[in-house]
Amino acid sequence: GTSGQVLTSNGVGVAPTFQTAGGGSDSVPAFRAKLSASLSISDAAATKVAFATQYFSTGGTYSTTNYRWTPGTAGKYYIEATLIANTSDGYNGIFANGEMYLYKNGSELTILSKLKPYDNGLNEGQTDQETLTGAIIDIANTTDYYEIYVYIDTHTSTAGTDLETGGTTFQAFLIGGA
């Protein structure tokens, strides 16, 4: 073979041949986005996560205006999100529970991650930090769209909860045809 070719099997009892390597394309629908600034979350209310900065979006299918991703190509997709949440106000700021949702076409598709932390003995004024992360494989058509929502409940409604910019991300890519 020559540079750029791979040895390909032609089946049992048939000699293999060298063919031009395939796969790997810059046109495969994919994106990765993150928060552009810390995002305050209302206590005990589902909140859409505003992923306003994109690392990349092949085909321009991620909207930093609507904070949603539309694949644009039918197929099976790996979809993943990670949220890093911080609270303050000591015991009152400790997470009672939290959930991260994947919405498809404006409705909840699944709970990607659930959080039920334990009382970690924080004192007043200390910060609690928790991570929600999850992934799913879903079949999408060309016009489906996906969004991430988060629900966080602290012990009292007075505690503030913010999503951190550094590790809070939303990403997806095509893994195969429908």
Residue ranges and their predicted role:
Residues 32-35, 53-108, 135, 146-149, ...:
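Beta-rich globular "head" domains
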Residues 158-163:
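Short proline/glycine-enriched turn/loop segments at secondary-structure junctions
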Residues 14, 40, 86:
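Short, acidic Gly/Pro/Ser/Thr-rich loop/turn segments
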Residues 110-123:
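Solvent-exposed serine/threonine-rich low-complexity stretches and specific carbohydrate-binding patches
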Residues 121-145:
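Short, surface-exposed tryptophan/glycine-enriched loops
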Residues 1-28, 65, 73, 94, ...:
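Extracellular repetitive beta-rich solenoid segments
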Residues 25-52:
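Predominantly extracellular/luminal regions of secreted and cell-surface proteins
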